[in-house]
C-alpha cells in the first residue's frame, strides 16, 4: 500500500433494499405541539382532540366544536350566506378572502351562528373559527354576532359564544374596530333585559375580541391553556421592560387574577354548560307562591 492510498476515499456499493418503501398516509398521525407525543389521528379525535399525554387542547374548527357541544351536533344556522366584501378597497384583500374560502369550504366567514339545544335547552350560539383569517373580527363577523345577540333577545333564549381570534381585521380598519362597540352595545341591551350570556374563551382569544363581547359574559369560561389577552406578550415585555411569568395570559393565569370564572376541560364543557342552563331555567309547574 502506498502512502497516497491512506487518504483516498473508499468506494461503497449501494445494495437495493428488498422490502418496498411504505408510504404513511397523510393525516394518519399527529404530533402534539406541547409535549411532542405522536398519536393516531383517530385516537386523538376520540379524545375530543385533547392530547392523552399532557392534556393539551388542540384547536377546533367551528363545525367540530358545534358537533361536540350541541345535541346531535344539530344547528339551525343564521346568515349562512353572509360574507365579507372589500369596502375600503384594501390592496390584496379580495384575493385573500377567496383563498380563505377555498381553504375552508365549510366557512364563508370566521364565525358560525345559529340556534340549537344543549341537554334539551334551546340556545343561540356563535362559534368562531381561527382557521378563517385567524378568527379576525371584521364587519361581517361583528354583524353576525350582533344578529345572534338580537335573536337571543327577541326569542328570550340564552346566548353562548365560543371565541377564538387574533383581534380586529386590519384590512377593514375603522369598520372593524366599530364592531367592538356594536357587539358590546347589543349585549348591554340583551343583558339589561335579563338575558343570559355564557362566554367561552378558546385558544387563542386576543385583541379586539377579548376587549369587547368575549369578556362581557355573565359567566366567563375558558378551555385549559387557552391564550387570553389583548396585546401580545413580547409587546408588553418591551413596553414595561420586565420579564412576565411563564404562564402569563393563559386561562389559568386569568382565572387566578379574577378575569375568568372557571377553566373547563373539553370533556366537561357540555356538562358544565348544561348545568349553568339548568340553573337559569324556570321549570314548568314550578311554584312561585310565597
Swiss-Prot record:
Binds 1 zinc ion per subunit. Residues 28-290 form the CoA carboxyltransferase N-terminal domain. Its EC number is 2.1.3.15. It is found in: Cytoplasm. It catalyses: N(6)-carboxybiotinyl-L-lysyl-[protein] + acetyl-CoA = N(6)-biotinyl-L-lysyl-[protein] + malonyl-CoA. It is an enzyme of class 2 (transferase). Keywords: ATP-binding, Cytoplasm, Fatty acid biosynthesis, Fatty acid metabolism, Lipid biosynthesis, Lipid metabolism, Metal-binding, Nucleotide-binding, Transferase, Zinc, Zinc-finger. Zn(2+) binds at residues 32, 35, 51, 54. Transmembrane segments: none annotated. GO terms for cellular component: acetyl-CoA carboxylase complex. GO terms for biological process: fatty acid biosynthetic process; malonyl-CoA biosynthetic process. A zinc finger (C4-type) spans 32-54. Its main location: cytoplasm. One of its GO terms (molecular function) is ATP binding. Pathway: Lipid metabolism; malonyl-CoA biosynthesis; malonyl-CoA from acetyl-CoA: step 1/1. The keyword Cell inner membrane does not apply. Its cofactor is Zn(2+). Pfam families: Carboxyl_trans (PF01039), Zn_ribbon_ACC (PF17848). Acetyl-CoA carboxylase is a heterohexamer composed of biotin carboxyl carrier protein (AccB), biotin carboxylase (AccC) and two subunits each of ACCase subunit alpha (AccA) and ACCase subunit beta (AccD). Component of the acetyl coenzyme A carboxylase (ACC) complex. Biotin carboxylase (BC) catalyzes the carboxylation of biotin on its carrier protein (BCCP) and then the CO(2) group is transferred by the transcarboxylase to acetyl-CoA to form malonyl-CoA. Belongs to the AccD/PCCB family. This is Acetyl-coenzyme A carboxylase carboxyl transferase subunit beta.
Amino acid at each position: 500500500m502506498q502512502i497516497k492510498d491512506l487518504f483516498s476515499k473508499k468506494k461503497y456499493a449501494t445494495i437495493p433494499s428488498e422490502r418496498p418503501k411504505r408510504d404513511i398516509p397523510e393525516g394518519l398521525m399527529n404530533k402534539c405541539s406541547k409535549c411532542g407525543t405522536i398519536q393516531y389521528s383517530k385516537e386523538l379525535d376520540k379524545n375530543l382532540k385533547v392530547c392523552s399525554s399532557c392534556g393539551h387542547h388542540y384547536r377546533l374548527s367551528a363545525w367540530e366544536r358545534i358537533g361536540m357541544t350541541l345535541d346531535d351536533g344539530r344547528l339551525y344556522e343564521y346568515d349562512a350566506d353572509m360574507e365579507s366584501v372589500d369596502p375600503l378597497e384594501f390592496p390584496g384583500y379580495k384575493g385573500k378572502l377567496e383563498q380563505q374560502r377555498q381553504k375552508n369550504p365549510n366557512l364563508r366567514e370566521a364565525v358560525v351562528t345559529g340556534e340549537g339545544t344543549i341537554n334539551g335547552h334551546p340556545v343561540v350560539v356563535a362559534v368562531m373559527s381561527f382557521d378563517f383569517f385567524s378568527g379576525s373580527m371584521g364587519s361581517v363577523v361583528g354583524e353576525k354576532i350582533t344578529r345572534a345577540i338580537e335573536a337571543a333577545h327577541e326569542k328570550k333564549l340564552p346566548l353562548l359564544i365560543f371565541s377564538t381570534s387574533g383581534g380586529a381585521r386590519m384590512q377593514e380598519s375603522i369598520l372593524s374596530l366599530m364592531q367592538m362597540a356594536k357587539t358590546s352595545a347589543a349585549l348591554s341591551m340583551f343583558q339589561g333585559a335579563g338575558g343570559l350570556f355564557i362566554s367561552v374563551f378558546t385558544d387563542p382569544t386576543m385583541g379586539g375580541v377579548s376587549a369587547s363581547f368575549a369578556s362581557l359574559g355573565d359567566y366567563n369560561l375558558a378551555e385549559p391553556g387557552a391564550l387570553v389577552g389583548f396585546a401580545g406578550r413580547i409587546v408588553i415585555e418591551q413596553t414595561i421592560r420586565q420579564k412576565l411569568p411563564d404562564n402569563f395570559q393563559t386561562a389559568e393565569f386569568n382565572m387566578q387574577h379574577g378575569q375568568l370564572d372557571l377553566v373547563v376541560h373539553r370533556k366537561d364543557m357540555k356538562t358544565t354548560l348544561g348545568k349553568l342552563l339548568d340553573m337559569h331555567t324556570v321549570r314548568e309547574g314550578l311554584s312561585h307562591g310565597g
